[in-house]
Amino acid sequence: MNKINIKKVVLAYSGGLDTSIIVKWLQDTYRCEVVTFTADIGQGEEVELARTKAKAAGVKEVYIENLREEFVRDFVFPMFRANAIYEGEYLLGTSIARPLISKRLVEIAHQEDADAISHGATGKGNDQVRFELNAYALDADIQVIAPWREWDLSSRESLMDYAQKHGIEIDYKKQLKKSPYSMDANLLHISYEGGILEDPWAEPEEDMWRWTVSPENAPNKAEYVEITFKKGGIIAINGKTMSPASVMEDLNKRAGAHGIGRNDIVENRFVGMKSRGCYETPAGTVMLKAHRAMESLTLDQAAAHLKDELMPKYAEMVYNGFWFAPERKMLQAAIDNTQEIVNGIVRLKFYKGNVTVVGRQSKDSLFSEKIATFEDDEGAYNQKDAAGFIKLNALRLRLKALK
């Protein structure tokens, strides 16, 4: 990349140690103006502090945007309509946040007539891939600066030394006492990596978990919750209509209080290595269970089974950074077509780390009590018909058995 041609850069900025250093590094290395962008997607931090820190670093244009509703409505909910889960365990909390941030980075770059965008993802992880693939899908000519792939800073200590040397304001005592884990949070989840988690045999300390109580210490009384779906999306909890972001906030609080949503995973990163992460996804755990329950009542068998076959590929696309790719959009269109009839109410029980479906109802239900009953069905189903069905399906098996 020709540094001479870089006059203005839009940086995805959190206000933390890494991105605070990146501001100064970009200014010194590229001799460019830096515009910062901070997305509020429910990370639970005081995002306005990012404005103060950016201004102190000499940033003139600071973008701080509340994207909570857009994040859930246009990214989280569509993903959950697919029942997406990566490698059978991961609910994609970090993965699904990256497309929206990339989208706004590109849009702000266009608005500011910037020459490049930049992010603080390391050269070892998935996020660098996600940020950049999503950005290139929206602007083929966008230039991306990834400082972690260029500079020689390789540890927290080296970052702190750089900050001290260049007069970057950070709370050194806070940094030294900082959690040993690398954390990332939004309305869908909070993740933990690093520290003792780098040993896959080591159990995380109880005080690591921030959103959920230990199931052992959860209430001894179960809580019943009714979730209302319309076209595959949650629109109400216990009869109270809520916005998408409010749904997430409510379920995170309710489910977290019962110890629901903890997960400890070793996953295969897109870049090739295995990585261990711990996740708290209270609302997502509930949503997946409830949505599958609603689909079990309303979706045709073959459509439901085909959807399940497509889901791992969909989840892989999200995980790897292909949200804006044509194949993900194609699958989304097919999935959303199935959701027109996913309407109704699911009743759940929360108790000591478990979420159990205890009831479901829908005006679009395909369940026929008259046909399914073990009692007299008054001729609704002729059991004699099953003989021919079995005989035809057994044909290839019988032919094989004759050999």
Swiss-Prot record:
GO terms (BP aspect): argininosuccinate metabolic process; L-arginine biosynthetic process; urea cycle
PROSITE patterns in the record: ARGININOSUCCIN_SYN_1, ARGININOSUCCIN_SYN_2
The reaction(s) this protein catalyses: L-citrulline + L-aspartate + ATP = 2-(N(omega)-L-arginino)succinate + AMP + diphosphate + H(+)
Gene Ontology molecular function: argininosuccinate synthase activity; ATP binding
InterPro entries: Arginosuc_syn_C, Arginosuc_syn_N, Arginosuc_synth, Arginosuc_synth_CS, Arginosuc_synth_type_1_subfam, AS_cat/multimer_dom_body, Rossmann-like_a/b/a_fold
Keyword annotations: Amino-acid biosynthesis, Arginine biosynthesis, ATP-binding, Cytoplasm, Ligase, Nucleotide-binding
UniProt feature coiled coil, ranges: none
Binding site for ATP: 12-20, 39, 120
EC code(s) of this entry: 6.3.4.5
Broad class of where this protein is predominantly found: cytoplasm
Origin: domain of life: Bacteria
Tagged with keyword Amino-acid biosynthesis: yes
Compartments where found: Cytoplasm
S-S bonds: none
Binding positions (L-aspartate): 122, 126-127
Binding site for L-citrulline: 90, 95, 126, 130, 182, 191, 267, 279
GO cellular component: cytoplasm
Pathway the protein contributes to: Amino-acid biosynthesis; L-arginine biosynthesis; L-arginine from L-ornithine and carbamoyl phosphate: step 2/3
Enzymatic class: ligase
PANTHER family: ARGININOSUCCINATE SYNTHASE
Assembly notes: Homotetramer.
NCBIfam families: argG, PRK00509.1
Protein family membership: Belongs to the argininosuccinate synthase family. Type 1 subfamily.
Name under which the protein is recorded: Argininosuccinate synthase
Organism: Ruthia magnifica subsp. Calyptogena magnifica
